């Protein structure tokens, strides 16, 4: 969602929600055919939710942007059958969802994953910005790269930056609650993981948490 759309949502929330629903529904009809084509192919299905790794070989990117392979509102159920996906990856998506929306999406991921399939996630590390606020660490200007979201009044704006992102962010994570959320969802062998240069975006490594879990 663009910054302008976020501002309009704050002023006219009901109108913007209805507009997004109608537009997304219309745009997603062709996407159902693309999902069906994935199922008909002989290759393993690997989904990149949020499209951060768009173009990564072997992964199908899915999000509400035309740059992705498949245009889809991830707040809605995935049009895929149970136990049909080998791997799911998501980078810097879940902070844009409310806690409830994030829980629903994780449940969808578990539903479509095959037994033994992996769910790998990357999100911003809120603790970095909170540590800056309480004086535990100093962080460089690159941690506030999106200028519309950084007001730079006092130390609290380090927290405001990552928590709200000018209306873009809905929920924040540290490693403890990220691992708890994944484990509580039913994933097993949940653990933190290292940066993966074949998948994760290097320019976001400095502010990111990584975790992975497996469907039983």
Where do the model's predicted regions map?
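Conserved SAM-binding loop
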Residues: 44-131, 211-216
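Structural motif
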Residues: 38, 79-80, 182
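Membrane-proximal basic amphipathic "stem/tether" segments
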Residues: 1-42
């Amino acid at each position: 969602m663009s910054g302008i759309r976020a501002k309009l949502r704050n002023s006219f929330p009901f109108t913007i929600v209805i507009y997004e629903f109608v537009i997304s529904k219309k745009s997603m009809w062709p996407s159902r055919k693309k999902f069906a084509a994935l199922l008909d192919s002989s290759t393993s299905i690997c989904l990149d939710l949020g499209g951060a790794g768009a173009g990564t070989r072997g992964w199908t990117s899915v999000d509400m942007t035309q740059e992705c392979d498949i245009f889809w509102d991830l707040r809605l159920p995935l049009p895929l059958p149970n136990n049909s996906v080998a791997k799911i990856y998501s980078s810097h998506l879940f902070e844009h969802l409310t806690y409830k929306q994030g829980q629903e999406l994780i449940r969808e991921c578990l539903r479509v994953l095959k037994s033994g399939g992996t769910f790998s996630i990357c999100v911003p590390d809120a603790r970095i910005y909170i540590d800056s606020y309480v004086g535990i660490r100093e962080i460089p200007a690159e941690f506030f790269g999106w200028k519309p979201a950084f007001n730079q009044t006092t130390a609290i704006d380090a927290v405001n930056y990552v928590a709200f992102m000018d209306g873009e962010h809905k929920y924040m994570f540290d490693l403890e609650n990220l691992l708890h959320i994944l484990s509580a969802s039913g994933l097993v062998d949940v653990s933190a993981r290292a940066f993966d240069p074949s998948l994760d975006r290097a320019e976001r490594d400095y502010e990111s948490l990584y975790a992975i879990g497996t469907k039983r």
